[in-house]
Amino acid sequence: MAAKAEISWKRTDDAGEKVQVYAHHVGDRWLFYWRYRRYDQWQALEFPPFEDWMELLDAVRRRVQRRLLRPEEIGRIEKRIRELFPEADITTDERG
């Protein structure tokens, strides 16, 4: 049985509007999409903000603990975050 390759969450944008975001795992990369309302079309999010990457990392860590994703995926996402946001602090104490 294959693991679900989509992870979604909600956040607010800079203008205070609620936004739905989902990340889709394709090969070795994650593609991000967003929309404002349930029946709006999903639009590709070409440059996801740091907060979205951290939401994805948190969700992947939880899925790894439940054996829904492979542990290597955490390292791949952390590496990608460091490439995109070199000044960012990524704490890994949750792996414990």
Residue ranges and their predicted role:
Residues M1-H25:
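Short, charged/polar N-terminal "headpieces" of proteins
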Residues Y22-Q41:
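Short beta-strand segments and strand-loop junctions that repeat across beta-rich extracellular domains
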Residues R35-G96:
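Mixed-charge, Lys/Arg-enriched low-complexity segments
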